């Protein structure tokens, strides 16, 4: 790794310089959070009115302490010592208060007097040594009061860069203070907070916009989970269409449950819309459906309310699109892929350039009315409603496979940017791109990929009239863009207006910021905070490399979802919240008051699993820079290399769950190791032709799969297995090898007795792993269901 090699060459003396440089990026308050800009000027510690760690209330409290000190000192002495008292009291407001008071480590006692530089301490001792006793209850400090050298040693800091008052003139600490920290190469250093884990390819996270501040997380297999503002998860799924969803465990299968969106006036009506893959015989389709929330439980969908709005046949198993969004206009925007395979080979110009095809498009429909024999209405201002050769649903064309789009909420103060539609469009051989989608525009595919021609004849067609992306990057940086969001949240003002996105294959986080004067977009990579930047409670500096999707919560804060194993059945997905360690909003400004929601399901509390890594490796970046604007020649004449043929089977498509295996966290390059199943994982093995949810139970323990004996096997044990597999109900516990004997495996569990609430069979009472008095003709099985068998 480039950064690692650099450190290896630096000697002990130079390493101190490096530490000082790293310290420049680490302002922190005594509450272990970033400093802020007070909403109103401070009257006592006025030097920290622009940026620091005190509110007006805290400033007033320090002023009261100052006045108390004045009453406890002789007037003549106070005239000499008041300046020292002001200096020391106000260091609680310093943007580096955590360093001044040795609060970097929450486990160590907090100083009562800030760390002082030697010269300052010696001068203060000479004239105002009695002030130390009044400032601090520390009796050890009191005992040193008469010994100048020992006292000043006691009040010194190990890191002298932070001692007062030298830190006030330290250029490394004060240049760009309060701005997003960037390294020498311009890589923005941010931190993360783990929000949820144990998810199977989390493809989407959305909120309902109803004031509840719940968020709903969709897994590729077809389950949607409800999370409350305290990050606990409801045990019962919000939605379960896993029996209808077409997907597989293959790493690289792009099919599955791909997107959802709540009606813009939710909960009146209490509708939501979903986007998923289905199979009918040997044909595959994408389906857009409407559901209603259950009248008896606002955290559960009425599964019988499904109304299919639109189905589009997919000629191949990849490039399925998957995004659903409602705009400010109240219309539903649907983002479809070009139908799959390489080079959009369907018809003379491909699906994406064919206005009469719904594939390779951005569609826009009205879900609140029906017309023309359709299950939806056509907005009257759709661009091609009067074109007899076009589908009226088409809003924009020339799309290859837009994976993750978002509407800009607009600047919180001015509203600038509101309604802009950003999309990441996955490329073919050379480029990934970010587009600003507008009504009636053509985004170039398959004529163009990024800024370059892909199909020479189409590219030279004067009627193409395509729009270039706002940004495109070569495959040196990544091979599968994941579109993100423009940050418009409250908590981190420095991020306002920053478009943050990523790449699924390289695990790279990236950002764009628009220059309002030129309209150009500036690219910056996003890195995890180095050194101690993120070393505070609740923050981490690493993530799993396969970036699947981005999200924003109801308050506008930014998240992303990634996994170490890109399979729809691997529970390795994690949701991370993006944190700016350089500056936060003033305390209390972003407080939310969630609307109350009745909870009828058991709650599963959130338990973080990810850890802060103390020596993160820097991320090597290619020397070739990604283009941030179009080349001067609008129409390149040279054709790109012929497209690489792609397999028609969905085992290794160009989009989500990637072609490479691996589960390493993103610090340097992703690891190539594939994690094995967790201890206690289960699977069902069933004879051919048997429906899903029924089969012989096999359990993974100690690195191997094995069977379970049916002694004491009952529906409580079956319920544990079914819940692990994503089913809400256990219909029955099967015995006597009803679903076949697992003779090739060892018998791993016997005499299993469960209460029914355990997370896996290992938590149930049992005879001991590998201990049994049975044969395979007693192999246990289960029958699971998404529906209550008693209804």
From Swiss-Prot:
The places in or outside the cell where this protein is found are: Secreted
Q: Name one GO cellular component term.
A: membrane
Task: State if Amino-acid biosynthesis is listed as a keyword.
Answer: no
Q: Which residues are glycosylated?
A: 240, 461, 679
An example of a Pfam family matching this protein is Folate_rec
Q: In this protein, which residues make up the domain named SRCR?
A: 682-785
Keyword Magnesium assigned? no
Basic residues compositional bias, start-end: 652-669
Q: Which SUPFAM superfamilies match?
A: Soluble quinoprotein glucose dehydrogenase (SSF50952), SRCR-like (SSF56487)
Could you tell me the Gene Ontology terms of the biological process aspect for this record?
Answer: artery development; cell migration; cell population proliferation; smoothened signaling pathway
Which residue windows does the record flag with biased composition (Pro residues)?
638-650
Composition bias of kind Low complexity appears in: 620-629
* InterPro entries assigned to the protein according to its UniProt record, in alphabetical order: 6-blade_b-propeller_TolB-like, Folate_rcpt-like, Glc/Sorbosone_DH, Quinoprot_gluc/sorb_DH_b-prop, SRCR, SRCR-like_dom_sf
Q: Which domain of life is it from?
A: Eukaryota
Chain spans, region Disordered: 610-689
Endpoints of the signal sequence: 1-27
List the disulfide bonds in this chain: 187-527, 191-534, 405-423, 490-590, 709-774, 722-784, 754-764
Keywords of the record, alphabetical order, are:
Disulfide bond, Glycoprotein, Secreted, Signal
Q: Which family does it belong to?
A: Belongs to the HHIP family.
Can you name this protein?
HHIP-like protein 1
Which organism does this record belong to? Answer: Mus musculus (Mouse)
């Amino acid at each position: 790794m480039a950064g690692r090699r650099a450190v290896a060459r630096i000697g002990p003396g130079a390493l101190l310089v490096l530490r000082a440089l790293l310290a420049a990026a680490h302002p922190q308050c005594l509450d272990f959070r970033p400093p802020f800009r007070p909403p109103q000027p401070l009257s006592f510690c006025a030097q920290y009115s622009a940026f620091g760690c005190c509110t007006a209330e805290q400033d007033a409290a320090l002023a009261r302490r100052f006045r108390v000190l004045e009453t406890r000192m002789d007037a003549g002495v106070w005239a000499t010592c008041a300046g020292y008292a002001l200096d020391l009291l106000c260091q609680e407001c310093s943007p580096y208060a955590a360093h001044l008071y040795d609060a970097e480590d929450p486990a160590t006692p907090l100083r009562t007097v800030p760390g002082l530089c030697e010269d300052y301490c010696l001068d203060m001792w000479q004239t105002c040594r009695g002030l130390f006793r009044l400032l601090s209850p520390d009796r050890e400090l009191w005992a040193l009061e008469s010994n100048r050298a020992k006292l000043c040693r006691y009040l010194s800091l190990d890191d002298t860069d932070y001692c007062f008052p030298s830190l006030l003139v330290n250029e490394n600490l004060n240049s760009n203070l309060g701005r997003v920290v960037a390294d020498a190469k311009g890589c923005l250093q941010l931190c993360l907070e783990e929000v949820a884990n144990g998810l199977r390819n989390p493809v989407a996270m959305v909120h309902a916009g109803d004031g509840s501040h719940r968020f709903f997380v969709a897994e590729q297999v077809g389950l949607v989970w409800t999370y409350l503002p305290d990050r606990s998860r409801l045990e019962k799924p919000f939605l379960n269409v896993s029996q209808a969803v077409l997907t597989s465990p293959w790493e690289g299968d792009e099919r599955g449950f791909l997107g959802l969106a709540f009606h813009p006036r939710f909960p009146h009506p209490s509708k939501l819309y979903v986007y998923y893959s289905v199979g009918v015989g040997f044909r595959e389709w994408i389906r857009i459906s409407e559901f209603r929330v259950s009248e008896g439980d606002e955290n559960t969908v009425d599964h019988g309310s499904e109304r299919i709005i639109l189905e589009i046949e997919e000629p191949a198993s990849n490039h399925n699109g998957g995004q659903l969004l409602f705009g400010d206009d109240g219309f539903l925007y649907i983002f479809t892929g070009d139908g799959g395979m390489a080079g959009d080979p369907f018809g003379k110009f491909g699906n994406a350039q064919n206005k009469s095809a719904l594939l390779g498009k951005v569609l826009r429909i009205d879900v609140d009315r029906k017309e023309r024999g359709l299950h939806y209405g056509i907005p009257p201002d759709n661009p091609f409603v009067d074109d007899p050769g076009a589908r009226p649903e088409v809003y924009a064309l020339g799309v290859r496979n837009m994976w993750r789009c978002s509407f800009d909420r607009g600047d919180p103060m001015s509203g600038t940017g509101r309604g802009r539609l950003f999309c990441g469009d996955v490329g073919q051989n050379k480029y990934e791109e970010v587009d600003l989608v507008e009504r009636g525009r053509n985004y170039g595919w398959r004529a163009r990929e990024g800024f370059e021609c892909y199909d020479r004849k189409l590219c030279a067609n004067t009627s193409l009239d395509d729009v270039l992306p706002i940004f495109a990057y070569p495959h040196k940086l990544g091979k599968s863009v994941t579109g993100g969001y423009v940050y418009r949240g409250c908590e981190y003002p420095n991020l306002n207006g920053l478009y943050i996105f990523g790449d699924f294959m390289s695990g790279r986080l990236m950002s764009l910021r628009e220059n309002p004067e030129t309209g150009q977009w500036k690219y910056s990579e996003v890195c995890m905070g180095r050194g101690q930047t993120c070393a505070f409670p609740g923050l981490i500096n690493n993530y799993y490399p396969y970036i699947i999707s981005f999200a924003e919560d109801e308050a506008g804060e930014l998240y992303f979802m990634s996994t170490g194993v890109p399979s729809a059945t691997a529970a390795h997905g994690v949701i991370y919240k993006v944190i700016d360690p350089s500056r936060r909003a003033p305390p209390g400004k972003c407080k939310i008051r969630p609307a109350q929601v009745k909870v009828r399901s058991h709650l599963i509390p959130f338990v973080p699993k990810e850890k802060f890594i103390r020596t993160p490796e820097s991320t090597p970046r290619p020397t070739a820079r990604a283009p941030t604007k179009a080349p001067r020649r609008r129409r390149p004449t040279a054709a790109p290399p012929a497209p690489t043929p792609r397999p028609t089977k969905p085992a290794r498509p160009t989009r989500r769950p990637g072609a490479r295996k691996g589960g390493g966290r993103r610090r340097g390059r992703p690891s190539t190791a594939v994690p094995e199943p967790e201890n206690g994982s289960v699977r069902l093995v069933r004879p051919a032709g048997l429906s899903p949810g029924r089969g012989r139970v096999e359990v993974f323990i100690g690195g191997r799969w094995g069977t379970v004996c049916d002694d004491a096997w009952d529906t409580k044990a079956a319920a544990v297995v079914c819940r692990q597999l994503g089913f809400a109900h256990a219909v029955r516990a099967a015995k006597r090898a009803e679903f076949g004997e697992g003779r090739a495996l060892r018998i791993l569990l016997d005499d299993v007795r469960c209460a029914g609430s355990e997370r896996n069979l290992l938590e149930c009472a049992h005879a001991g792993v590998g201990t049994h008095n049975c044969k395979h003709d007693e192999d246990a099985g289960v029958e699971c269901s998404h529906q209550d068998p008693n209804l």
